[in-house]
Amino acid sequence: MTYPERPLLHLLTRTSLVVQIIVGLVAGLLLASFFPAAALKVGFIGKVFVSALKAVAPVLVFVLVMASIANHKQGQQTHIRPILLLYLVGTFSAAVVAVIASFAFPSSLVLASQPGEMSPPGGIAEVLQALLLSVVDNPVNALISANFIGILAWAIGLGIAFRHASDSTRNLLSELSGGVSLIVKVVIRFAPLGIFGLVASTFAESGVEALKGYAHLLVVLLGCMLFVAFVVNPLIVFLKIRRNPYPLVLTCLRESGMTAFFTRSSAANIPVNLQLCERLGLHEDTYSVSIPLGATINMAGAAITITVLTLAAVHTLGIDVDVPTAILLSVVASVCACGASGVAGGSLLLIPLACSLFGIPSEVAMQVVAVGFIIAILQDSAETALNSSTDVLFTAAACQAEERKASAA
């Protein structure tokens, strides 16, 4: 009796998630075009998917950050400091580019609901006051109410405290982190069904206008990533090595960025990057540390995604943003981006943290995350390509700068 089901199961497990999401997206569009009444009913599937994301996100951020800080190994710094600085400068610069682009070309999203109870902040002073109150929130309440800033504060604090714990305790935290990550991966496997429901109901209600909104959003996102890859990063590298950066930039994009675009995983691209560093003749003790580290904290693409989608939500809801608050968002996006590598679904699940700066409720923020999943086919690939290629680029720039200093001495 179960035999006929096996080919379908086999097909689902063998087909990549990207292909399944494309199928879900196309199926949702077709259903909305030809059977709008039925499309509205399957919107329930999308709601279930968003609710699952909403449920798992606070626990994920808390456990992941706490475990990563607790298990961080001290020592072995040699040439890592200048590379770390480049990683931080690159990520912050990407967030600033995204802020400028979002102000120049504001994007609007089609959201299912826009609650009237929102109280947007009046300026930087109010934002900082709310930020401080969020930081000192009760940890249990922070998890229940999805207060991501409070969750982050407690996770960092406990992570630092657990660094002095026994090996067995730190191993337990690692295993707990692995368990939560596995649950997230299971939720993400249902993304094609969730996207199908979301796309079908969204286009049945809003029609082609929603598609135009996503197209504009994609252009802004990909435009920012291309600008960072071909203008900002080369400028940073030029200031470091004092010669034409483009041969190195193009090599990194071709050798590392292309594979990362299709694997959509910075971690999976680490062996490719290590091999490229070896071919470039870089210092092995340096790149063996900086490349895995970069796959964790060097997240220019994630900073762009978090910033652009957050400001798209802000613009959609009619919230005014002053310049100091935008700068604060750049900092928050950079910090959030550093934690994006450990999250299945990348930077998207960290958007609620940035949205909370502007008083945007969790349910609206998770709708923005759902929009992110709809455009993730291109966004996630481009984001990973930028992140991973920049790991090699900045490592090579720092190594070449050190060699230049040594030869000049």
From Swiss-Prot:
It is a multi-pass membrane protein. Disulfide bonds: none annotated. The chain crosses the membrane at residues 17-37, 49-69, 83-103, 142-162, 180-200, 218-238, 299-319, 331-351, 357-377. GO terms for biological process: serine transport; threonine transport. It holds the Pfam family SDF. One of its GO terms (cellular component) is plasma membrane. It catalyses: L-serine(in) + Na(+)(in) = L-serine(out) + Na(+)(out); L-threonine(in) + Na(+)(in) = L-threonine(out) + Na(+)(out). It is found in: Cell inner membrane. Belongs to the dicarboxylate/amino acid:cation symporter (DAACS) (TC 2.A.23) family. This is Serine/threonine transporter SstT.
